[in-house]
A protein has these predicted regions:
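Short, flexible, glycine/charge-rich loop motifs used to bind or transfer phosphoryl groups or to couple energy/partner
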Residues: 36-37, 108-109, 139
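Active-site neighborhoods of divalent-metal-dependent phosphate/nucleic-acid chemistry enzymes
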Residues: 73-134, 156
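Short, well-structured N-terminal submotif of metal-dependent ribonuclease cores
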Residues: 1-48, 57-68, 74, 92-98, ...
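Residues at the C-termini of beta-strands that transition into short coil/loop
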Residues: 50, 80, 150-153
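Acidic, PIN/NYN-like endoribonuclease modules and their adjacent C-terminal/linker elements
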Residues: 1-4, 18-19, 24-27, 112-158
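Short, catalytically relevant binding-site loops at active-site mouths
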Residues: 12, 52-55, 83-85
Length: 158
């Protein structure tokens, strides 16, 4: 079976954004994201969701259009009542801060839809070594296997 990846909005933004000339870390993340997209994406079934679409529509109109075009290449995972309930549990049970509602939904949509990986550059609330164990616990207690949350760099193969 082909593994599945939920592509979170930060990855899509790094793929479609202008190359950052000022911040070397962001520039490196953009390059790693493009490398993963060009060399690895075909090894996975890729998903987004209505949450990704909502976030991708914000900001500069031309860049938003580019993000939306890229999202059209992905399958859409459903934002079900179960996903909304799990997102609320992630927020209420201190796995994520209350301001991270969209981040909780990304995790919940991936978990409820049985998606293997959640690909992100959001290291504050998602790909965060302190948050991941709490997220995993809440998902499992709710009866869902959590996605493996990682950056494009972590999902590369030699």
């Amino acid at each position: 079976m082909i593994p599945s990846v939920y592509v979170e909005t930060s990855v899509i933004s790094y793929l479609t954004g202008r190359r950052n000339q000022r911040d070397l870390i962001v520039a490196a993340h953009q390059e790693l994201t493009r490398e993963w997209w060009d060399s690895r994406r075909q090894k996975f079934t890729l998903y987004a969701s209505a949450v990704v679409i909502e976030e991708a529509r914000r900001g500069n109109a031309a860049l938003a259009q580019a993000r939306m075009e890229l999202i059209q290449e992905l399958r859409l995972a459903d934002v079900t009542p179960s996903a909304r309930e799990l997102a609320n549990r992630l927020l209420l049970e201190a796995a994520l801060p209350t301001k991270a509602n969209a981040d909780a939904l990304h995790i919940a949509v991936a978990a409820v839809n049985g998606i293997d990986y959640l690909l992100t550059w959001n290291c504050s609330h998602l790909a965060n070594a302190f948050m991941i164990p709490r997220v995993e616990k809440v998902c499992r207690v709710a009866g869902f296997e959590p996605p493996y949350i990682c950056t494009p760099q972590e999902l590369m193969e030699d």
